[in-house]
Regions:
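Residue-level signal for inorganic ion chemistry
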Residues: 16-17, 38, 49, 81, ...
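Residue-level detector of anion-binding/catalytic polar loops
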Residues: 55-57, 172, 192, 217
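Conserved beta-strand termini and adjacent loop/short-helix elements that scaffold enzyme active sites
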Residues: 28, 61, 176-178, 221
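Acidic beta-strand-loop-alpha-helix segment within the catalytic core
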Residues: 96-183, 226, 233-255
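Oxyanion/phosphate-interacting regions
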Residues: 1-2, 7-8, 161-167, 184-255
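N-terminal subdomain of lithium-sensitive/metallo-dependent phosphomonoesterases centered on the IMPase/IPPase/PAP
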Residues: 1-78
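Glycine-rich active-site/cofactor-binding loop and its immediate structural neighborhood
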Residues: 73-113
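Conserved acidic residues
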Residues: 70-72, 104, 142, 192
Length: 255
């Protein structure tokens, strides 16, 4: 089955990003925010998905999480909420279709530039319909995206120790504030890797499949598979195959 209607559904929310709305901001925990726009976009997409695909369950970041369904949509309405609040780029919409724990279809939408990243399992990854592929870059020439998960300050020392070590062994590091953005940078070859010590399934589900279908590899920081969506949090490392093992060694030596 194809899911082309999801593209129009996600694109229909673009105006929330291109025209600033009145924001009501709630702090769920330290530096972990949700806005009325997060909730509105999630509800809009939920209702549209139910109309288009009534047989598929729905799980969103801003609702109670239940990943026990055999078949469900997994949505992050605004990945990069702090950026959105501050009027900074990037923020993205992430939607994954999960079947028996595995992502089988993914779409990430960049509403600021009207760019879609899509993947069906086993069919490759695409940017606005054109095939994308991870880079073949080596460690000393690599750009690595770094996520800091600012609402988990107990991981601060480990995160920045790893980031420093990676910086010393690569060309440079980047910090965007959006896991989806970081993952599509890897998938398109604009960066060689991305790591973060604390992410939820909705943060990375769509990006995981897109990176894999673009020829990359995704694991936790110990090299274990993240292919099964689970409740809770995990570390994540996405890269081209060339530098994955080297990065795992650097991370393990510094966390």
């Amino acid at each position: 089955m194809r899911y082309e209607q999801t593209i129009d559904i996600l694109k229909s929310q673009r105006h929330y990003f291109t025209h600033r709305a009145h924001l009501e901001i709630e702090e769920k925990s330290r530096a972990n925010y949700v806005t009325n726009v997060d909730k509105t976009i999630e509800n809009n997409i939920k209702q549209a998905l139910h109309t288009a695909y009534p047989h598929i369950n729905f799980v969103g970041e801003e609702e109670a999480v239940n990943l026990a369904y055999d078949y469900y949509w997994l949505l992050d309405p605004i990945d990069g909420t702090q950026n959105y609040i501050k009027g900074q780029y990037p923020s993205m919409i992430s939607l994954a279709l999960v079947e028996k724990g595995a992502v089988v279809y993914a779409v990430i939408y960049d509403p600021y530039f009207d760019v879609l990243y899509t993947a069906y399992k086993g069919e490759g990854a695409f940017q606005n319909g054109s095939p994308i592929h991870v880079s073949t870059g080596k460690m000393n020439k690599a750009i690595v995206m770094v996520g800091t998960a600012p609402y988990t300050r107990n991981l601060t020392d480990g995160t920045f120790k790893v980031a420093k070590s990676i910086y010393e062994h690569t060309s440079d590091i980047r910090r965007s504030g959006s896991a989806c953005y970081d993952l599509v940078q890897v998938a398109t070859g604009r960066a060689e890797a991305y790591f973060e010590l604390f992410v939820h399934s909705w943060d990375y589900a769509a990006g995981l499949l897109i990176v894999q279908e673009a020829g990359g590899v995704v694991s936790d920081m110990e090299g274990k598979s993240l292919n099964e969506m689970k409740v809770g949090t995990t570390s994540i490392l996405a890269s081209n195959h060339n530098i994955h093992h080297e990065l795992i060694q650097l991370i393990e030596a510094n966390v």
